[in-house]
């Protein structure tokens, strides 16, 4: 709970903003003293679906749109532009969109005896896994197409990000018809075999190749993501074991 500080003074609502703010009425309070509220109450919702339902009922003032609620809230036209569905507009809900520069990734434990280290064997395993995990498919299924597959740690809009062929991850992608194209899974399977695991088994012992994933995720939405990820590893005959941690 945040309450008004009786000793705060001297700040007013801005009179300038982004293009379109004035037309949207966001600058109507120009010059008025802040804050406008006496108290702000914040609560934490652990699950996305209950949070979304409470937002629709008016318990929350703002909400992001999860993949589970995307079709209910947003429609996409043939040009790729997004707009609220009629149901959302009737509730008086407004859609605010922006381009967010951020990066999320899954990392390898470089101390792991199987996929860690800088030996040619472990390096090829990491490369094979990177090719096999189809990030384009992940974005399409779980993020409703909102995002692009990373080519480096730098997202678009950050200084140093390179566009075009010179900016692609050539280990995972080829440059085809003016855009990056993920290498076929056959390349990943070949790398696994070159690492000493033909058909996903150690060529010396015959033991299956097992990779552990430590994750803090939970809930129904997370299970579907982990099931999808398990299938990605299975494409190159690698067994993925998910280990939940605190």
What are these regions (language model features)?
Residues 48-51, 66-70, 104, 121, ...:
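Stable alpha-helical elements in mature extracytoplasmic
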Residues 115-116, 148-197, 215-225:
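Structural transition elements
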Residues 7, 56-60, 113, 125, ...:
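Sec-exported extracytoplasmic/periplasmic mature domains
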Residues 19, 28-30, 41-112, 136, ...:
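Extracellular/periplasmic solute-recognition and catalytic clefts
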């Amino acid at each position: 709970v945040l309450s008004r500080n009786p000793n705060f003074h001297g700040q007013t609502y801005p009179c300038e903003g982004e293009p379109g703010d004035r037309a949207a009425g966001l600058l109507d309070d120009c010059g008025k003293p802040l804050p406008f509220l006496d108290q702000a109450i914040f609560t934490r919702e652990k699950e996305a679906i209950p949070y979304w339902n409470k937002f629709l009922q008016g318990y929350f003032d703002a909400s992001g749109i999860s993949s589970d609620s995307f079709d209910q809230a947003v429609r996409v036209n043939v040009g790729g532009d997004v707009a609220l569905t009629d149901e959302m507009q009737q509730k008086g809900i407004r859609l605010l969109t922006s381009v967010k520069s951020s990066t999320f990734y899954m990392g390898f434990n470089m101390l792991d005896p199987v996929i860690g280290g800088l030996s040619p064997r472990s390096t090829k395993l990491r490369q094979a896994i990177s090719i096999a995990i189809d990030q384009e498919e992940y974005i399409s299924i779980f993020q409703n197409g909102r995002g692009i597959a990373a080519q480096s740690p730098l997202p678009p809009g950050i200084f140093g990000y390179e566009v075009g062929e010179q900016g692609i991850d050539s280990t995972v992608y080829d440059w085809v018809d003016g855009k990056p194209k993920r290498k076929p899974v056959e390349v990943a399977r070949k790398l696994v075999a070159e690492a000493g695991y033909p058909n996903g088994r150690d060529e010396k012992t015959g033991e299956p190749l097992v990779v552990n994933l430590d994750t803090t995720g939970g809930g129904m939405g997370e299970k579907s993501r982990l099931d999808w990820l398990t299938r990605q590893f299975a494409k190159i005959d690698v067994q993925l074991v998910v280990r939940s941690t605190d």
